[in-house]
Regions:
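Catalytic domains of cell-wall/extracellular-matrix polysaccharide-remodeling enzymes
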Residues: 1-102, 106-127, 131-132, 138-141
Length: 141
């Protein structure tokens, strides 16, 4: 079952895009990652009716765990562990080609090792290894 009605979903999505627009972020690509990456067939259908496509990050890459903090116990993943996962995945036969990476813009204050502080170094190294970073529209065409 769903936790939201179609009307509340449509209203919420429209308000979120309106707020992003007010802040100067244009979402002309029509892709979005649903809150908590939670969605099902109905959400996909409703999104498509609005002209949007829900997407998700690529599994296996644990960057989305950058929101976690030590008090979460087994669900916590340190920035060292997240980064090691990136380098491990990059060494696989297809590497990180085509990966959609989710990194949170902000995290809980209880997380002291902010993964986003490492992004510049990681991106620079991946570029040296030949990776290119592309817009989601280019990736999914």
């Amino acid at each position: 079952g769903l936790l939201v009605t179609k009307d509340s979903f449509i209203h919420d999505l429209e308000m979120n895009f309106r707020e992003l627009d007010n802040l100067g972020f244009r979402n002309d690509n029509k892709y979005f990652i649903p809150s908590y990456e939670w969605y099902n067939k109905e959400i996909v259908v409703w999104s498509k009716e609005m002209g949007y496509t829900p997407i998700n990050y690529t599994p296996r890459l644990r960057t989305a765990a950058d929101y976690s903090y030590p008090e979460m116990g087994k669900r916590y993943l340190s920035s060292d562990d997240i980064e090691m996962g990136i380098w491990k995945e990059s060494k696989q036969p297809n590497g990180l080609n085509g990966f959609i990476v989710l990194v949170h813009m902000g995290t809980d204050v209880r997380r002291k090792d902010k993964f986003y502080d490492r992004l510049g170094k990681i991106i620079d190294q991946l570029k040296k290894e030949g990776y290119q970073f592309v817009d989601i529209r280019e990736l999914l065409q």
